[in-house]
Every structure is written in C-alpha cells, then in structure tokens.
Amino acid sequence: MVNEQKRFALFLATSDSTFVKKAYGGYFNVFVSTFGEDGEQWDLFRVIDGEFPDDKDLDKYDGFVISGSLNDAFGDDDWIVKLCSLCQKLDDMKKKVLGICFGHQILSRIKGGKVGRASRGLDMGLRSITMVTDAVKPGGYFGSQIPKSLAIIKCHQDEVLELPESATLLAYSDKYNVEMCSYGNHLLGIQGHPEYNKEILFEIIDRVVNLKLMEQDFADKAKATMENAEPDRKQWQTLCKNFLKGRSEQV
C-alpha cells in the first residue's frame, strides 16, 4: 500500500521583503525549507492579502503553519478576524496548527487568552528559553529527553499576557512568561522564530532602523546577542516537524 502524500498549508501573515524575495524567493520558501520534507505538498495562502482556503478543502490537509506578522494578533482587521474564525474551525476539527510569533498569539486569542503589547517592550535578538519539563511528555514531539533550555531568535513587540485555562505552558524566559504553549495535542504556539537565521534577523533590524522605528543602540545590542552564539535551529526544526507530522525523534 502506497502512503498518501502529506499536505500542509502556510498561512502567510506578512508581506515578503525585497531582501527575502531576492535571497530566498519569499518567506514561503523559508518556511518550507525549515519544516518541509521530500514528497510533501505545501500550499501558500497569503492571508494578509485575503487569500484563504475553502472550508471544504480543510480536511485535505495534515497540518497548518501560521507565520509571524507586523500586524497585531489582537487587531480587528477583516483578514485577522477571518483567520481567527478559520483557526477555530481547525481547532474543532483537531487539525495540527503550528503558530509562530503572531500565529502563536492568534492561537491564544481564539482559545480565550489575553494578547497585547509586551509588558517589557520590544524584543529582538537571540534568547534562551526555559522548558517546563514537568509539562512536556517524554516520547512526544520533544523526543525521549527534554532539553532544559533552547536558544531561539526573537522579534516581537506583542505577547500572550494571559493563557486560557485550556493551555499548557511549555516554555518561558526571564523576560516573558509565555514563550511556548500547547492546547491539547493539536495546537502549538511558539513566540520565537524557528525559521529565522542571522541573515534574516539582521536585515529586519537594519530595515526597522532605517525607518526610524528603532534606536541604533537597541539594534546594536540585538545584533550583539548573536556575536558568539547561534539559535538551536536544528532542534527547533526537529521539534516542529515532530509536532506537525506526529513523530517523536529526539530534539
């Protein structure tokens, strides 16, 4: 019996920058190269531009990924409200949904959590987050051994301020109480960016500085976090793939 091709969808909640288009061909390629594997089908829906799958097609997918965004997850833009409605349907269907940054906050919003401006302000750079090892089940998407901490690239000004009762806190940091959380076995939110690398982060920082939206001193400090350290990208990649594809390889 031949296994059916797995099918996933990316809900892109941001526009491709000129740099990302030139260097990677767009954010879709960044996500697929991070979370995708040979033999899979990945579809792109630019939700920020109003592109959404038909309800009748949702069951054809094995999982979904919601990207980061410059927009507020607590906003009432038409496309954000529609995305929330879609995610509620996926939750009811118990479909796997991985939320990254803005996507993480969207998942909390639809489950009844509180999302807003980060209480300790904008965060950019490499950060270490601590796992709540008691909350993580061995043999799940972390594998048999749970790491005490993992480094990840951060780039956000909003956060999950209060988790809903249905959430399980999986990770926190010295600056934010909610760095990663799950809802049942089918929704997973990560505040950081497993898909980012140093090149992508630095270009975003430079662009924000040029727009006069960030002080140079703050930008320099953000870049300095990656002078002698790197994100645990392979571990995050394994974790996210395990979650989306129902595996338990060691992170």
Curated annotation (Swiss-Prot):
GO biological-process terms attached to the record: proteolysis
Residue span, Glutamine amidotransferase type-1 domain: 17-214
PROSITE patterns the UniProt entry points to: GATASE_TYPE_1
EC number: 3.4.19.-
GO CC annotation: cytosol
Family that this chain belongs to: Belongs to the peptidase C26 family.
Function in brief: Involved in glucosinolate biosynthesis. Hydrolyzes the gamma-glutamyl peptide bond of several glutathione (GSH) conjugates to produce Cys-Gly conjugates related to glucosinolates. The gamma-Glu-Cys-Gly-GSH conjugates are the sulfur-donating molecule in glucosinolate biosynthesis.
The protein, known as: Gamma-glutamyl peptidase 5
Taxonomic classification: Eukaryota, Viridiplantae, Streptophyta, Embryophyta, Tracheophyta
